[in-house]
Regions:
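…primarily DNA-binding HTH/wHTH and HhH modules…
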Residues: 235-254
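Amphipathic alpha-helical segments enriched in hydrophobic/aromatic residues interleaved with Lys/Arg
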Residues: 74-122, 126-127
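A short, Lys/Arg-enriched amphipathic alpha-helix from helix-turn-helix/homeodomain DNA-binding modules
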Residues: 117, 139-177, 198-217
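C-terminal regulatory or interaction extensions
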Residues: 129-140
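Terminal helix-turn-helix DNA-binding modules in bacterial transcription factors
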Residues: 190-229, 251-254
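Append "Primarily bacterial transcriptional regulators
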Residues: 28, 172-179, 184, 188, ...
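N-terminal regulatory/effector-sensing and dimerization cores
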Residues: 1-78, 109
Length: 254
């Protein structure tokens, strides 16, 4: 379906079947789906009433939103990564939905589209704020996540997997902790100020420093052991992250 979809079920007291899995939505959930994204699923029970907003990309094609809507990462989140709202947040979100509904049912004039798009942007910006709160308030989950990511990358970087499959990808890392890549990156950004790709690079550089400092491997050999196809790519990343070339780092360490 070639629409952006924003759906909120404030009174949902059931479970959502997505693929082969069931997810608990007892708190209600605000869900975002990008155009042509597969979102097939079914509610097994509970109150299904709520709000659904479908927005065709052409509706805001001539507005700044067309360029920066991709910056709202939650349009790429999975069904089990919905935004769960507090009572105050529910009031805010429902007020915006109701305002949009009222505007759509009013007489169209020269300002209708401007007003609707401003409200859509308001909805998206509030959702950004509330997702940030969700990341922060679920600290126990966040701590476990960071520990698990550390374990996954340490195991990967110390195994032959690195030689055979190359540098770990964000997709691989996300699959190991059962998150979508976008949700993982946004959560990491809120916790440590880095997205998932930057986090992987940080761990690669730490491993590279270890090899440069404790072995006699050449820079090319270090690069290949870390999964780089081309030593130049490794040297470029190392210089970007440390302001030193691999050889300069080795000399300074010695």
């Amino acid at each position: 379906m070639n629409f952006y979809k924003i759906a909120y079920k404030p009174n949902l007291q059931g479970k959502f079947k997505y693929g082969q899995h069931f997810y608990d939505f007892d708190e209600g959930g605000l869900v975002f789906v990008s155009p042509n994204q597969v979102s097939a699923g079914q509610l097994t029970n509970g109150d299904h009433s709520g709000y659904t907003l479908l927005i065709h990309p052409d509706f805001f094609l001539t507005y700044p939103l067309a360029k920066h809507i991709t910056q709202y990462g939650f349009f790429s989140y999975a069904a089990n990564e919905a935004l769960h709202l507090s009572d105050t947040e529910k009031t805010t979100i429902m007020a915006i939905f109701n305002f949009i509904g009222g505007e759509l049912n009013s007489r169209i004039d020269d300002f209708s589209q401007d007003v609707l798009i401003s409200q859509i942007e308001l909805l998206l910006n509030y959702s950004n704020r509330f997702y940030k709160r969700q990341f922060i308030t679920r600290k126990a989950l966040s701590g476990d996540l960071l520990q698990r990511l550390e374990e996954v990358l340490t195991t990967y970087l110390n195994s032959e997997t690195l030689l055979h499959h190359g540098i770990p990808t964000v997709q691989y890392l996300a699959s190991c902790v059962h998150f979508s890549p976008s949700y993982l990156s946004d959560m990491l950004r809120s916790l440590i100020g880095q997205n998932a790709q930057q986090y992987i690079h940080q761990k690669l550089i730490e491993k590279a420093k270890e090899k440069l400092a404790t072995t006699s491997l050449t820079v090319s050999e270090v690069a290949y052991e870390l999964g780089f196809e081309h030593p130049q790519s490794f040297s470029k990343l190392f210089k970007l992250k440390t302001n030193l070339s691999p050889l300069e780092f080795r000399r300074s360490f010695n």
